Amino acid sequence: MPLNIEDKKAVVAEVSAQVAKAQTIVVAEYRGITVGDLTKLRATARTQGVYLRVLKNTLARRAVEGTPFAGLAEQMTGPLIYGISEDAVSSAKVLNDFAKTNDKLVLRAGSYNGNVLDAGAVKALASIPSRDELIAQLLGVMQAPVSGFARLLAAVAAKKAEGAPAEAEAPAA
């Protein structure tokens, strides 16, 4: 059923609102994917905070017009699914991970920070840890010396409680 002009304006407004908040847009060709697989992809995207939508390319071009993602308009041909995310790597990760398990989804292009990315650059972007993962790694690195020192103090306290002289442990390098 074709959309009337009011429906088209509503779709463009909805997608434009998502694009305004986005850091990354990834475009992939979905030709030949079953409805069940597409439903799984949508569920995964939803849990990762990625806005995933199949759009008419003309409506998508209008939604990105006048934004840092306008350069992506040249890549908008054929049956495409659009992944839009506020996180820099989420949409690339979701679509790239799905493309690894389903060869019918082909990454076409993306846009990040005002730059248009080819499929290889989108895959490279997907390999970068997310902000939350980076914070967790940083906290782990910062916490390691403190937890080692706490274990050392606990060992010294245990030795003293036993009545044996405590041996100094060599500091970890």
Curated annotation (Swiss-Prot):
Top-rank lineage group of the source organism: Bacteria
GO (cellular component) term, any one: large ribosomal subunit
InterPro entries, A to Z: Ribosomal_uL10 (IPR001790), Ribosomal_uL10-like_sf (IPR043141), Ribosomal_uL10_bac (IPR022973), Ribosomal_uL10_bac_type (IPR047865), Ribosomal_uL10_CS_bac (IPR002363)
GO biological process, one term: translation
One Pfam family recorded for the sequence: Ribosomal_L10
Any one GO molecular function term: structural constituent of ribosome
Keywords: Ribonucleoprotein, Ribosomal protein, RNA-binding, rRNA-binding
Family: Belongs to the universal ribosomal protein uL10 family.
Self-association state and partner proteins as the record states: Part of the ribosomal stalk of the 50S ribosomal subunit. The N-terminus interacts with L11 and the large rRNA to form the base of the stalk. The C-terminus forms an elongated spine to which L12 dimers bind in a sequential fashion forming a multimeric L10(L12)X complex.
Described purpose of this protein according to its UniProt entry: Forms part of the ribosomal stalk, playing a central role in the interaction of the ribosome with GTP-bound translation factors.
Full protein name: Large ribosomal subunit protein uL10
Organism: Cupriavidus metallidurans (strain ATCC 43123 / DSM 2839 / NBRC 102507 / CH34) (Ralstonia metallidurans)
Gene that this sequence comes from: rplJ
